[in-house]
Amino acid sequence: MEVAMVSAESSGCNSHMPYGYAAQARARERERLAHSRAAAAAAVAAATAAVEGSGGSGGGSHHHHQSRGACTSHDPQSSRGSRRRRRQRSEKKKAHYRQSSFPHCSDLMPSGSEEKILRELSEEEEDEEEEEEEEEEGRFYYSEDDHGDECSYTDLLPQDEGGGGYSSVRYSDCCERVVINVSGLRFETQMKTLAQFPETLLGDPEKRTQYFDPLRNEYFFDRNRPSFDAILYYYQSGGRLKRPVNVPFDIFTEEVKFYQLGEEALLKFREDEGFVREEEDRALPENEFKKQIWLLFEYPESSSPARGIAIVSVLVILISIVIFCLETLPEFRDDRDLVMALSAGGHGGLLNDTSAPHLENSGHTIFNDPFFIVETVCIVWFSFEFVVRCFACPSQALFFKNIMNIIDIVSILPYFITLGTDLAQQQGGGNGQQQQAMSFAILRIIRLVRVFRIFKLSRHSKGLQILGHTLRASMRELGLLIFFLFIGVILFSSAVYFAEADEPTTHFQSIPDAFWWAVVTMTTVGYGDMKPITVGGKIVGSLCAIAGVLTIALPVPVIVSNFNYFYHRETENEEQTQLTQNAVSCPYLPSNLLKKFRSSTSSSLGDKSEYLEMEEGVKESLCAKEEKCQGKGDDSETDKNNCSNAKAVETDV
């Protein structure tokens, strides 16, 4: 044994730490750690008791300072220093055991004991670090508030309702995310994105609350899924609304109305789609008498007398147009021309010697001409209608800017100009044959303007109004069509002229003469009065016809699309008007809703929510009526019929 010890010392082994001594050292180290942990737990308990007792009036300040002292003893710097010192001690232990290994002393230390000792030390070090981290999580922290610095102990970090830690309140206000479920398709965005438009459905927290699903913590909308991509992009882009290609226009418009993006966004979207801005609702006069007159002449659907006035106006317009056409017949035209020439003063070269004395002796003048009398009656009605509408209109400036009122003025003025000219010539006498012929030609041109009276029918025709809206919305396409035709006419007229220049019997004597042929060919009419003869001219004609088909076909689909839009919009307005009229005439509608819809000046429902409110009121009234019928057995036959037809009335509404 002594020989082994001596040999160990001589070989450089550290013989003062055999295997038994190393085990005793590890046991003492564990004991020391257990004592230190117990002391730390006692200190924590004392600090907790001090904090809880700090609320008392007597010893509040003492416990407060004591707790603060405890807090300062466990600041982050001291904890980091203790961890550093403990790590250094662990490294020293490892180095000590490496030096005290006995590679040549097999009798004192078993084989493999060195690796086992180092592994146990590493495990103890990891356990100590984990315990230190847990203790650090449970240490004291400072929270600053209005009352100063306070120290409290907790095992968890301070939490708030947003779950964001110390600064979670501000973080949740600006970066809180929201989930929107649209028919099973989930979208995720931030609250601040939706808050850019607080007047919309998604931007107003109160409006979107009714769609919130607390179980899944999301907002659910049973709406069109492809449309919501554009709706969400409206919030993300700051107000840009673009319809997806795979969504029809009417469906996307309904979605925009549902999410309450606003009238301005809807109007801008329609302008981007190529539609004109819709006319604003025409206001009614404030004066009650003017209001009734305005409704009588402007809104035929407002009452039965208004409908009767509209029928009379249409009949007068038709009579005026028929008279305008009949007076051009040969059997009426000769006599009327003679009367017009006679009233122009003198009959020099305009009347022959046999017809003039006959007309003068018979007393036949323009004032007793049957056509003139009928024309006068029509003009009296037109003038009366125009003056009354001008008197009762809400705004004189807007009244004279309306195209229909301008047409009324243009259709009335020729009569008074003709009448004034006739009276002036009769009083002044004849001033020469040339002046009389000039006056006669001017009167004919003025009388031609009466043909614009046919446009007065558009006031009472929905189809003509739709056509007018379509043409106004398609002005850009129509201008493009005319521009293409103009280029084609110039190009092919020049080409056919030079192609037919060497032909003596050609119809194209000049380029302007070929304009007519180019227009007729490009519009695929082909009268045949002018046609090319040479081979080159026929080739030019073929190309002209093909180019005309392509030129006309390009803008036509856009015009047809505009017509379909205005037609469907008018059809929907008529359906909503019918629903409103049925609702107002329904005997089961509550009195408050009935008064609301009767007081409405619009002929259609502006929002579906109003119709849903009306439908809900009808259902409540029907339920009350059914309960009344079931509770009373001796009701009259009328009440029984009303109760039995309750479902039918509900279906109609």
Swiss-Prot record:
Residues 512-523, 524-531 dip into the membrane without crossing it. GO terms for cellular component: axon; axon initial segment; dendritic spine; membrane; plasma membrane; voltage-gated potassium channel complex. InterPro entries: BTB/POZ_dom (IPR000210), Ion_trans_dom (IPR005821), K_chnl_volt-dep_Kv (IPR003968), K_chnl_volt-dep_Kv1 (IPR003972), K_chnl_volt-dep_Kv1.4 (IPR020467), K_chnl_volt-dep_Kv1.4_TID (IPR012897), K_chnl_volt-dep_Kv1.4_TID_sf (IPR037065), SKP1/BTB/POZ_sf (IPR011333). The chain crosses the membrane at residues 305-326, 371-392, 404-424, 440-460, 476-497, 539-567. Residues 36-52 have a biased composition (Low complexity). Inhibited by 4-aminopyridine (4-AP), but not by tetraethylammonium (TEA) and charybdotoxin (CTX). Keywords: Cataract, Cell membrane, Cell projection, Disease variant, Dystonia, Glycoprotein, Intellectual disability, Ion channel, Ion transport, Membrane, Phosphoprotein, Potassium, Potassium channel, Potassium transport, Transmembrane, Transmembrane helix, Transport, Voltage-gated channel. Changing residue 89 to Q: In MCIDDS; uncertain significance; mildly decreased function in potassium transmembrane transport. Residues 81-97 have a biased composition (Basic residues). Belongs to the potassium channel family. A (Shaker) (TC 1.A.1.2) subfamily. Kv1.4/KCNA4 sub-subfamily. This is Potassium voltage-gated channel subfamily A member 4. It comes from Homo sapiens (Human). The gene is KCNA4.
